[in-house]
């Protein structure tokens, strides 16, 4: 260090309790150059335990020496590794306790505006819209399943996380660079931060463990299908979601006591400034080392990352093996494999977008260093991770995409892509008072075909009724015209083309039926199967119904 320098002394204040703050720190400037010995002697002679000295060379704006007396009682950079969680600068030396931070020429304000004020807000709004659409589609009756309920819970957590990200990082980053939204920056943000910040941390933890739960559910369904009947049920999925939320709430409960709101009257102006500052708990070195660094790293990153990596490797191996034997897979097994492939993409995106935050937390925990630009990018990546699942569902989820088009583009699809359904049905007399009704349908849409076969057991009122209902020739069953097959008195056959459906999703049987409260076992042609009782409008019962749709 050179022999002469210009020294500037900045008096640091111990953070008081919430309330009106005392006058701002006082700056002392020495007009001429002083020697190192004079500087150190002046520093040691100053009273008060919270004094910091910044030594500036004459031709440099950056200090070459910083001396903090009794630094365990003051706020140091090392004690604030997570100020970015609140959108605050980790070193409050540059500002008063509360200060108007509007400065469009400051590089940090410009970067924060474009990364947080623009990108986080745009991505967040689109992500909220996508998650709402995902929740609507996944909650449809035809999408009712354990995995879809878990994905709905994941969308809920991601939506809350995006909202808190916008409130904490997106909107407050606009004012320091543009001068707009001062009312939010000064009168809203400081008062909601003590509650919104812990809610955001709860949502982040819940989102991570919902991703873990989804992967675990897919692992059981793909690798242990026999256990899936007991473990992967709709009721258990609700329990898994509640457990994840309760665990996240319990783990992040101390966050509610980490920050507080302070007020400061601007000297010479009729304005009261508000800002957020860390509480005494948040300034505790033990709390920071144990809870902020190690617990956060282990609970939010190490445990879920390692578990997700292992489970997805096992799922990928099973999917790869199944693809080699795809010809021998049943339709339900192919559907499970396709769903597992889609969720593999979800987890891969999760790894990619959370890798930088993981590196950043490791750097803070072990090296006590932090780059504010990287922190802002890290917050953006976490927001993107909570916003992209809808796109993955649209790209890889065939049924999800079909229902999405049906809900939001129903009229256009009906006009531009009419459906063509070929329907065939046959009814034979069993000779014991019942009819064996077999129907098949072929559904053509967008150049593809889908077939279904349905078997009914219809009571006719007595054996040998001469066809259907004891009549000969033509009869009517549920508004369906039956034609007697010549030479076969016990066989009635129907063949017709059904009118186009209003959308791409078709349910068979298409006639109006009401589902009774009970399920029964019915026997058709000596084949026993389990199904639902269906009741026609004329009170005739249909036995087992099995649909290939």
Swiss-Prot record:
The keyword Transmembrane appears for this protein: yes
Entry-linked Gene3D superfamilies: Rhodopsin 7-helix transmembrane proteins
Q: In which tissues is it expressed?
A: Expressed in ovaries, heads and bodies. Expressed in dopaminergic neurons.
The record's subcellular locations are: Cell membrane
Which PROSITE patterns does the entry link to?
A: G_PROTEIN_RECEP_F1_2
Q: Cytoplasmic side of the membrane: what ranges?
A: 139-158, 203-238, 311-341, 398-549
Which is one GO molecular function term here?
A: neuropeptide receptor activity
Glycosylated at which positions? 59, 70, 93
Q: Can you list the GO cellular component terms from the UniProt entry?
A: membrane; plasma membrane
Membrane-side (Extracellular) residue stretches = 1-117, 180-181, 260-289, 363-376
* Transmembrane portions of the chain: 118-138, 159-179, 182-202, 239-259, 290-310, 342-362, 377-397
Q: From its record, what is one biological process in GO terms?
A: neuropeptide signaling pathway
The record's statement on gene disruption is: Deficits in simulated flight behavior with fewer or shorter duration of wing beats in tethered flies. Dopaminergic neuron-specific knockout leads to shorter flight duration. RNAi-mediated knockdown, either in adults or during pupal development, results in similar deficits in simulated flight behavior, whereas knockdown during larval development has no effect on flight behavior in the adult. Pan-neuronal or dopaminergic neuron-specific RNAi-mediated knockdown leads to significantly shorter flight bouts.
Keyword entries, A-Z: Cell membrane, G-protein coupled receptor, Glycoprotein, Membrane, Receptor, Transducer, Transmembrane, Transmembrane helix
Q: How does it sit in the membrane?
A: Multi-pass membrane protein
What InterPro entries does the record tag this protein with?
Answer: GPCR-Ligand_Int, GPCR_Rhodpsn, GPCR_Rhodpsn_7TM
SUPFAM superfamilies (UniProt xref)? Family A G protein-coupled receptor-like
User: So what does this one do?
Assistant: A receptor for the FMRFamide peptides. Reacts with high affinity to FMRFamide and intrinsic FMRFamide-related peptides. By stimulating intracellular calcium signaling through the inositol 1,4,5-trisphosphate receptor, Itpr, in dopaminergic neurons, may be involved in the maintenance of neuronal excitability and in the regulation of flight bout duration.
What family, per the record? Belongs to the G-protein coupled receptor 1 family.
Question: Could you tell me what this protein is called?
Answer: FMRFamide receptor
Gene behind this protein: FMRFaR
